[in-house]
């Protein structure tokens, strides 16, 4: 258990949602908790957004700082559902919160306006003969110019009875992209080069090349070997 070392303290909270996403586009994954007390006997509890500050003390564990209050999204309402999506298509992920004690709230992210980093949004499109239509379960790796590799899975459903945009969202910091690597659920890996930053990339699944059937050739060779082995015996009997 490394949460205390990382600065993540949620032991006394009632957490309904947990999301890793790069809210500030700096290239590392931040951590969101949607929190809501379940009855009047528990004191008001606040949502948390832990900003990933990297490994500040060299212990091999990323250090996190809760910035939800600073950003104005802490609140004390019962946040029982959260969905992430870039609703305004500006390149950063916005947060939709559903509460049991008030109406839905949509928080617009201003990371792009603040110029904190570049981004990439990947939409996977599987085929009938390959993976599923949204590429659920597939692995996406973004290889950056400095050698960093960003890795995410495509998934469906998160938190308490929730689901977010199926697009896979990457914050890139100030890096450019060398190439993209998609491993489909078929096991086939597809490479995409010349990928632009600050763009939406639609990836159509490539099916693996068909496996060649050599059974007819193998049967012919085995038959020939058998004939050669039996030929002396057949000659003596004739």
What is the role of each PLM region?
Residues 14-25, 51, 80-89:
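Beta-propeller blade termini
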Residues 206-236:
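C-terminal cell-surface addressing/anchoring modules of secreted/extracellular proteins
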Residues 1-2, 41-67, 103-119, 145:
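Beta-propeller blade repeat segments, especially FG-GAP/WD-type strand-to-loop junctions
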Residues 2-9, 69-73:
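Surface-exposed loop and turn segments in beta-propeller and other repeat-based domains
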Residues 25-34, 90-98:
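Acidic/hydrophobic-patterned starts of short beta strands in beta-sheet-rich repeat architectures
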């Amino acid at each position: 258990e490394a949460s205390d070392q990382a600065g993540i303290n949620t032991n006394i909270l009632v957490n309904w949602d947990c999301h890793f996403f790069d809210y500030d586009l700096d290239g590392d994954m931040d951590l969101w908790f949607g929190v809501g007390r379940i009855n009047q006997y528990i004191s008001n509890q606040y949502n948390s957004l832990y900003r990933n500050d990297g490994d500040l003390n060299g212990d091999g564990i990323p250090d996190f700082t809760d910035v939800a209050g600073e950003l104005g999204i802490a609140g004390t309402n019962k946040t029982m559902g959260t969905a992430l999506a870039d609703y305004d298509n500006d390149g950063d992920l916005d947060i939709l919160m559903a509460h049991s004690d008030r109406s839905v709230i949509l928080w617009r992210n201003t990371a792009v306006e603040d110029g904190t980093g570049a981004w990439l949004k990947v939409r996977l499109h599987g085929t009938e003969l390959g993976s599923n239509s949204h590429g659920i379960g597939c692995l996406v790796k973004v290889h950056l110019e400095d050698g960093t590799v960003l890795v995410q899975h495509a998934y469906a459903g998160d938190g308490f009875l929730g689901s977010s945009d199926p697009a896979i969202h990457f914050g890139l910091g100030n890096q450019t992209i060398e190439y993209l690597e998609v491993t489909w659920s078929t096991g086939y890996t597809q490479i995409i080069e010349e990928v632009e930053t600050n763009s939406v990339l639609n990836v159509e699944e490539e099916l693996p090349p068909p496996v060649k059937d050599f059974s007819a050739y193998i049967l012919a060779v085995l038959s020939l070997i058998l004939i050669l082995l039996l030929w002396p015996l057949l000659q003596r009997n004739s």
